[in-house]
Amino acid sequence: ATSNSIFSFGAPQTSTATATGSGIIISDDGYILTNNHVVDTSSSNSSYSYYDISDATSVKVKLNSGTYGDDATYDAKIVGKDSQTDLAVLKIDKTGLTAAEFGDSDQAVVGEFVMAVGSPLGLDTTVTQGIISAVNREVESDGTKYVCIQTDAAINSGNSGGALVNSEGKVIGINTLKLSGSGVEGIGFAIPINSTLDVTSQLIDHNKVIRPYIGISGINLDDSTAKKYNLVVGVYVKTVQNFSPAEKSGLQLGDVIIKADDKDITTMDELNNIKNSHKVGDTMKLKINRKGEEKELTVTLEETP
């Protein structure tokens, strides 16, 4: 049943280059979830390499021929894309499709049996098997951090955007990255499906992801760094953007943010995670240390410009 909801697509990058990938049908009327990139590790020496789907001059979707026939190829529209989460939603003019069933990726456990479904190297609806090697694995690619499911199921060029499914055939992840290089085998990463739900909904509704922002840059202060500069542990405010929510709240250069919504913070990642749990228009409480004196500020979050 799962393979009925899998497709492959070709996205010509220039007049002489074509990239391919995989994806998942998420509605019976033609919405398809994939990555914001098309994996092509053979074209780069980087462990992670891809082309941005927005560079494509056209995108075509080929549905599972066993279900929809040999000529089931359609032009696709890019509904929305988000480079921060490496997700994109496509739309084809087709109804009566079989949508994939989602599992609960929060329940994924190490050692659990999984299958990677996609079109590696253009080999349509290929299935490889393995286990979940790790959960909540933090991976950085091109400056962006992802929290992923790690698997040893074979993931190759063209698998990107395809489904990682559990033993019930339910999608628990979007195959996204692999480590490659001499002596490296069986290290692939999938975006947990639960983390895609809100992004997918926003891409369909707004053609983009609407995120709140504060408007600062900061420096992480751990114990040793804080002691060295006679500061407290937290996030040192390095810059405050003009007319930003941070400036409007009274936050200043040199402040050290020590709590956000009553939670201790020591890194910008922690601050951003709390911020991202809010919606535009929400308020966020900050406790700061300013020249040895603690103060509380309230930031009203605005849409990222």
Predicted regions and their residues:
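Serine-dependent protease modules
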Residues: 1-227, 232-233, 241-242, 268-279, ...
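Conserved PDZ fold ligand-binding element
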Residues: 31-36, 246-268
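Short beta-strand/loop motifs in extracellular/secreted proteins, especially
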Residues: 57-59, 255-256, 284
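Short, conserved beta-strand segments of beta-strand-rich sandwich/propeller modules, principally
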Residues: 283-285, 296
